[in-house]
């Protein structure tokens, strides 16, 4: 009996050690990456259009991103607004760029929505174009409110409660192990809403973004 208990603890210790080693490898890998975008670059671009009608702001932002990074933003025919169900909330996203280590997307909701933020092996920042963003950080007893032009940063491994007012739209930039975020992003779609068409749209646009980055890496770079 004692031997069985000891074996269980041994497996737990080995599992935790493997997780620690994997985490270290992941962060070392991220340190070797040449990122296309910078968090502050995306935030500054979004601030230029904060307060405008969100559709006008998004169209201007896309034009500017294509000017700055012409081979790293999906073409118009690949842009699509896709529902996202995660953490008990529902929003919509339009993916502009994605790789294994970063992404840029447009995100928001036409209806107010409280939710759990999720925990990620990635840093995620949202610069607000319109509406309000309430954030309640883990370990605190008060929430913060963010308005158009402000940027909300969600660090790796952090968890918060968030709530958006109606017609809240933002520009989001993520950097880290991007495939690790898909579990949270798709869990409700698979196990709750069972909206498999949305699941297909999400995976398809991510695959196309990866294909664009691979093609750019192999055959061409930013001028």
From Swiss-Prot:
It holds the Pfam family ERG2_Sigma1R. It comes from the Eukaryota. InterPro entries: ERG2_sigma1_rcpt-like. Residues 2-8 are annotated as: Targeting to endoplasmic reticulum-associated lipid droplets. Residues 1-9 are lumenal. Residues 31-223 are cytoplasmic. It is a single-pass membrane protein. GO terms for cellular component: anchoring junction; cytoplasmic vesicle; endoplasmic reticulum membrane; growth cone; lipid droplet; membrane; nuclear inner membrane; nuclear outer membrane. The keyword Nucleus applies. GO terms for biological process: lipid transport; regulation of neuron apoptotic process. The record marks 126, 172 as: Important for ligand binding. Residues 99-106 are annotated as: Important for ligand-binding. Ubiquitously expressed with higher expression in liver, kidney and steroid-producing tissues such as placenta, ovary and adrenal gland. Keywords: Cell junction, Cell membrane, Cell projection, Cytoplasmic vesicle, Endoplasmic reticulum, Lipid droplet, Lipid transport, Membrane, Nucleus, Postsynaptic cell membrane, Receptor, Synapse, Transmembrane, Transmembrane helix, Transport. The chain crosses the membrane at residues 10-30. The C-terminal helices form a flat, hydrophobic surface that is probably tightly associated with the cytosolic surface of the endoplasmic reticulum membrane. Sigma receptors are classified into two subtypes (Sigma-1 and Sigma-2) based on their different pharmacological profile. Functions in lipid transport from the endoplasmic reticulum and is involved in a wide array of cellular functions probably through regulation of the biogenesis of lipid microdomains at the plasma membrane. Involved in the regulation of different receptors it plays a role in BDNF signaling and EGF signaling. Also regulates ion channels like the potassium channel and could modulate neurotransmitter release. Plays a role in calcium signaling through modulation together with ANK2 of the ITP3R-dependent calcium efflux at the endoplasmic reticulum. Belongs to the ERG2 family. This is Sigma non-opioid intracellular receptor 1. It comes from Cavia porcellus.
